Design a protein with these regions (language model features):
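One-carbon transfer enzymes
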Residues: 1-161
Length: 161
């Protein structure tokens, strides 16, 4: 039986990752993303890029406002009995009581070379601080923000323009 994977992400940055997992035959059981929000000048309600691609790929998705103290989502994930959760720029901190709900834990794909630029907006912070290089870190999620052990990383040079 294929591993059950939970995917958690929101912005356009996550779309190629979810598409790649799907196209390579990984069993994405459910996607979690931020709920639709008002944006742009007209304050039109827009769904996240991950919700859009989940609909296109016909993957079940959930859009809880928060996971903190959310018994419904906790019970859902407990019942799902997934093997692994992959988190990419989800936009919410995963509560510590959720971290034991998968067999192999939660991993985070973070857009910086940790420990540098923990937290939100690591790409923008690298550019604003004129860093010469940045990268991607894959880490296990712990109960502190972007502080679990790094499993792997990939560095790239930041070029002018």
């Amino acid at each position: 039986m294929a591993n059950k994977i939970i995917f958690m992400g929101t912005p356009i940055f996550c779309v190629p990752i979810l598409k790649s997992l799907y196209q390579n035959g990984y069993n994405i059981s459910v996607v979690f993303t931020q709920p639709p929000q008002k944006s742009h000048r007209g304050q039109k309600i827009n769904k996240s890029p991950i919700q859009g691609i989940s609909e296109t790929l016909n993957i079940d998705y959930r859009t809880p406002k928060t996971l903190k103290d959310n018994q419904e989502e906790y019970e859902f994930l407990k019942e799902l009995n997934a093997d692994l959760a992959i988190v990419v720029a989800y936009g919410q901190i995963i509560p510590s009581n959720f971290l034991n709900l998968t067999k192999k834990g939660f991993i985070n794909i973070h857009a910086s070379l940790l420990p540098k630029w923990r937290g939100p907006a690591p790409i923008q912070r690298s550019i604003m601080n004129l860093d010469k290089r940045t990268g991607i870190s894959i880490m296990r999620i712990s109960d502190k923000l972007d502080s679990g052990p790094v499993c792997n990383s990939y560095a790239i040079e930041i070029l002018k323009n």
